[in-house]
């Protein structure tokens, strides 16, 4: 035979762009500040809109027949995005008897819209990213069901091309052609950037004792839990919700087909369940007691006797309470990195 010989060389990669410039932002806002009840109450509201242009983006509307694709083209100042929304803040301070009370809250709603990104005209409107929020995930829509053995043999049940197993996720056939493929991907869930952010604080003090609480929350937001939902044996481990997996093993008397909430755990099986889908993107809205502190400030006169400028003892904590729809993981955690699959 012949001994192969390799030779290092160079080739042109992505084209450069010497004309890159700054983004352009045009902002407009209207605000109102109100004070009443001798300034005990303060209310602030602000309406805003921002239009950004010249955003760096790579064209995706160049035909493949040209010999170029998005991986070879340089980024250009072509993107356009609109952000608009409102925010308001309310605060209250008062002394009730010997108790000093301070309450406050804020709420922000901001929605973005992709106006232009040089996107090719795709076959179906639900595939387009234009007119969706920034950070909007795309993928398959999970029907809430899993493929059963009968489904695999039924030609009327839409299925993807390639390997598929009983217990895999069943996705919607959006275009009705009987095949689950890239034409069935659409915007799923909310954006990964929360549209709503809010918080409120409570502060009470009485004769040196004090209690400070700060709550924080977010809504209209989705998070992708790749490692935990896509790679079930991530870090060679499983989680409690994996107990609700799809199982059909009549010899051992196991049948969870009617109650399963998670696909079958199979190493080296179908990769179809790993595809981006609404199964992986969860509603990660939450309300959390972000910080809490209870303490006592010693009297100034006592501190002076001890030659101290001040003395305080306190207990504090963070993330003490969380209210969310997920339950088994921190809703602010977003595992976008590639997971690990265990060994058989």
Protein language model features and the residues they cover:
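Short, surface-exposed charged micro-motifs
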Residues: 33, 160-161, 201
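A short beta-strand motif that forms part of the nucleic acid-binding face
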Residues: 49, 60, 215-219, 228-229
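Extracytoplasmic gating/loop element in the C-terminal half of outer-membrane beta-barrel translocons
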Residues: 166, 218-312, 317
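Glycine-rich, aromatic-lined ligand/substrate-binding cores of catalytic
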Residues: 191-226
